[in-house]
Amino acid sequence: MTSNILQIPFRRSHTVSLSDAITQYISTKYDQRPDMFADDLLIIDRLRNEAIHVQEPHVSGISRLVTYAAQLKWLGGKFPVDIGVEFPWYPAFGFNTSRPISQNNIRFELANILFNLVALYSQLAFSVNRTTPDGLKQACNYLCQAAGVLAHLRADILPDLRASPPEDMDDMTLQSLEQLLLAQGQECFWQKAVKDGLKDASIARLAAKVSDFYAEGGDYAVQSNAISPEWIHHMTAKHHHFAAAAQYRQSLDCLEKRKYGEEVARLRDSEVCVNEALKESRWINRTVLGDLQGLKNRVTEDLKRAEKDNDVIYLNPVPPKSELKIIDRACMVAAKAPSQVTDAISMLGDNGPLGQPLFSKLVPYAVHIAASIYSDRRDRLVNETIIGELETMTDKLRDLLSSLNLPGSLQALEKPLGLPPTLVSHAEEMRQQDGLNRLRRSLEDTARVKANDKAAYNEGVELLAAEKAEDDSSRRKYGTDRWAREPSEAAASKLYTTAREIDGYFSSAQSSDNLVEQKLRDSEAVFRVLTGTNRDLEMYVPSSRRAAIPPEVERESIRLRGCLSEVSRLENRRKRRAQALKDKARTDDISKLQGWEAARLEREFPMQAIQASQFEDLFEEQLHLYDTDLEMVTQEQHEQDQISAQVREANRAFTRAHTGDASTKEREKALQELENGYLKYKEIISNIEVGRKFYNDLAKIVGRFRDDCKAFVHQRRMEASQIEGDITSVAAMASLNLSQPHLRQYSQQPTQPAQPVQPAQPVQPPNQLPPQPQPVQHQPPRDEPLTAPQPTRANTRPSMAPGVWSPEMGIRFGAQGTWDPSKGVKFS
């Protein structure tokens, strides 16, 4: 069926399982199970099958294509573009329409679906009845929508393809098709205007714009490698056709306005244009050619009449074409993509026209990463900036008390005999925890984790070293010209950098481990006393003589005791606040807020993968929950400064008022050593816990490092095996080429006279090898085409030595034509 408009052909595809790739990706990258989305997996495959089988112009295909396209846009924010399935599509234009192009790319799939939507709209316009005004209006609408989808594809989809588009989807091809669709839509409007009997001037303006659209489409088509010459000729003919039609209609307007000279000029130009269009008659269809012939007949008749009337009656001067006013353009079409294409994401929902979004309950992988980033940032704020600062302040306060020999000096005065209750409670706590043995077991556990980390790290380093040695050996063996791949350190620069970083972690951690072990050795004697019996404590702490306490000393001791009690209350309050802060952080769940933010990002930025960095504003807002805790740290520091000043002043007054004897001084020293020993015990426990957490976290890093090293070494060894195979093949071919000159030399030696042939003896035929072809030398391209070489054959067959069989002789058997194997082979 021929027509005066062109229809864009569909692209074709094979059935592939998108659900299998999505299932595999969810299994490996998400914390959710694929069976939670069993229905969605079935639906996505069904939508694809329905979409790729839209190959006929029927309006039902529109909903199938736009629904699947909307889901693809939605999936673009859930999954990476290279989801893991090769989408095969046959081109619609060009010279390779029988060979599919496959890409592991969701956007490539979306681009093909939208292209088929363009084809469907154009074929619907082709199939409607364009002999009626309503049919022309419907066809124009279809063509404008097709051009709009094409513009959306070119401007919004293909730039994010992350790969080279197919040949028939390059910019020149799509620009040409878009202008062609607009030209045909404008042509439908022009045809409707003719049927409705609009004024000739209006019809002329419409026709002029049709000509412009066809001209632009043809210009782009010439620069495309996919648009066929037949289509280019069609657009060229249409361009001249409507240029002629515009001038013809303008000439009728001139006749009506009695501009007889201008009428003749425009008819002459119309005739020139229609003749230009008829130059394409060999390549255009009968319908277009018939329209051109009809226009030419009308123009020719009117031109004869106009020239005769003007020459005989009106005698108006005929202006040259350069003086004719350019016909104004009336553009009645525009590229308008349907909202189901441009706003597809907003139309997905519970009551949306395009159905529910698939995999809506699947949390994007970036959200999981963002959640871990927030958790790390929150924990760092809580544990280091707030709790860590409180612990640092408490340590400074304890150091102050230790430097002032408190509370040992006060305890020695208040209780000259026996053990202070505080000391007894500290010793009981350490005994219940099996203090010294607990420290040793903790150090041994930490050492085991450290050894495992070191073993995994060494395994990865040894793999890298082995691969580097293999690569260097092959490079020395084959030379840098043939072994031209990157050296190991350049190919795995990130792995080598990671190895150096991990080695630095071990070095710095070893210094910390040595410091903790030194602390344990220095305090081991005191720990033995504290974990012993009360009898051991009493023997360690000497008693002083009980003496009357002067009123001034008693007054200052009470004051100092009050300051120490305030310090104890301060420490206990900080412990409670630290625990409350940990509970607050534990219940700080940002997942719901992240889900809302992810949904907003998916709606506002479809086809854009969500990145963890997009949640930064949410993180900052959520971390404001801890502003009051940060202010609390400042208040604690201010209060500690005041208490520290009070302790110093009270201790100075106490020291001036109290001068004890030698036994009192020894008791003070012993009590202070035990108090400091208890504090050192707490400090070492904290240090060991920090070290254990460090090595547990490091285990994940070195494990990932080792796995990456294994993958890299495997890939490099496979690559090395392939390179060695290529080198061996090239060497074999080179040795074959080197042997050919010797064969030629041997074949050119003079043949010795033939000897009499002995019966039943195998005869060695002389070499009759033809000269070997010389290697083709690559010459630079020349402007003129090269003449194809013609094969040459010898005119005469070389003579064969007697008794030598040649293929031309055929196979003949003597006697009865049978061969007896027992008699052997004889030549006669």
Curated annotation (Swiss-Prot):
Protein name (database record): pH-response regulator protein palA/RIM20
Sequence ranges assigned to domain BRO1 in this UniProt record: 4-397
Cellular component annotations (GO), alphabetically ordered: endosome
Assembly: Interacts with pacC by binding to its two YPX[LI] motifs.
InterPro entries membership: ALIX_V_dom (IPR025304), BRO1_dom (IPR004328), BRO1_sf (IPR038499)
Stretches for region Disordered: 743-828
Keyword Coiled coil applies: yes
CDD domains registered for this protein in UniProt: BRO1_ScRim20-like, V_AnPalA_UmRIM20_like
PROSITE patterns, per database record: BRO1
Gene source species: Aspergillus oryzae (strain ATCC 42149 / RIB 40) (Yellow koji mold)
Membership in a protein family: Belongs to the palA/RIM20 family.
Keywords, sorted A to Z: Coiled coil
Function according to Swiss-Prot or TrEMBL: Required for the proteolytic cleavage of the transcription factor pacC in response to alkaline ambient pH. May act as a scaffold protein that recruits the calpain-like protease palB via vps32 to its substrate pacC.
A Pfam family matched in the record: ALIX_LYPXL_bnd
Polar residues bias (residue ranges): 789-798
SMART domains named among the record's database cross-references: BRO1
Biased segments, Low complexity type: 748-761
Ranges annotated as spanning the membrane: none
Sequence ranges of Pro residues compositional bias: 762-774
Nucleus in keyword set: no
